[in-house]
UniProtKB/Swiss-Prot annotation:
The lineage of its organism: Eukaryota, Viridiplantae, Streptophyta, Embryophyta, Tracheophyta. Transmembrane segments: none annotated. PROSITE patterns: RIBOSOMAL_S18. GO terms for molecular function: rRNA binding; structural constituent of ribosome. InterPro entries: Ribosomal_bS18 (IPR001648), Ribosomal_bS18_CS (IPR018275), Ribosomal_bS18_sf (IPR036870). This is Small ribosomal subunit protein bS18c. Pfam families: Ribosomal_S18 (PF01084). Belongs to the bacterial ribosomal protein bS18 family. The gene is rps18. GO terms for cellular component: chloroplast; ribonucleoprotein complex; ribosome. It comes from the Eukaryota.
Amino acid sequence: MDKTKRLFLKSKRSFRRRLPPIQSGDRIDYRNMTLISRFLSEQGKILSRRVNRLTLKEQRLITIAIKQARILSSLPFLNNEKQFERSGLTARPPGLRTRKK
């Protein structure tokens, strides 16, 4: 093979195949919180199929299970618990809100 043809050949990269996110023994159910929580974002949103690497059927079942768990209040609809940290007390400027005695 001459050099001109070698330039167009792609090198075969070895890649490790990822494990499927849902094993064959896993049951997609609204009570299986460990499985369901893997497919939620930090904000509590359902992740897309491309991110999850699920088939269409699995994604549909996961979505239904998450929605059932939310309705039965096993899962929150929103996960927006923000940690507010106040660093010391802030002094208020005197002026508009002064109390009259």
